[in-house]
Amino acid sequence: NKIFTNCGTLGMLEEYGCAFEKTGRGSVKVSIRINPGEGAGHSKKTNTGGPYSKHGIWYENLSEARNIAKRHGLIISGVHTHIGSGGDMDHLKRIAGKLVDFAKQFSDLEVVNFGGGLPYQYDPNLPQDDISRYKSILNERVGILEQYFGRKIVCEIEPGRRFVAGCGYLVGEVRALNHTFEEDGKRLDYVLGNIGFCHLIRPMAYGSFHPIWIVGDDLGPDQNIIIAGPV
């Protein structure tokens, strides 16, 4: 097959190159994912760039990536980065600039993928992040590359989460109530539902915010409660 493979480590690039030489199958053109040395996200747990992220070839090792590709007869025609989920426009702009600088090191460049990470605000009481600048940021960066190489460069982004993050609801049922007391006598009330982190892991894994609405008749007065799952 001629699948355009994106290699995220030097080892992956080496493995692909060995298989390509041995079998003669696959695409001679490949892409590499670059770790630009920094990341951004709404928390450290959604940060996929920088020294504490496993993702991507470290930006100082790009010459080694070129050597591996040359040794196996591969052409690095694409570069890619993705720094995390929920970064702001200033971070995305800076990383896009870095990727342009990295891309100039690959003379056969055809495709540059700026990744995703466009922020989405789950809290209905807060304004949605403005991403109107993003198009102009990318147009400017791609224009720099096209001027540098003297040809058209394909620009790719991964905006999917921004568009679908608010498109669904997880519906559950209250199955039990419980309460405990702290040492000072303060009462803690729990609502136990039939849905939990096995259905929506994001709050537990990332500390992410998701609004909760309790629907029903005769809910009683407002009070502080702790929402818990069945496990």
Regions found by a protein language model. Give the residues of each.
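Charged (often Lys/Glu-rich) extended helix/loop segments that serve as interaction or gating elements
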Residues: 137, 143, 152-231
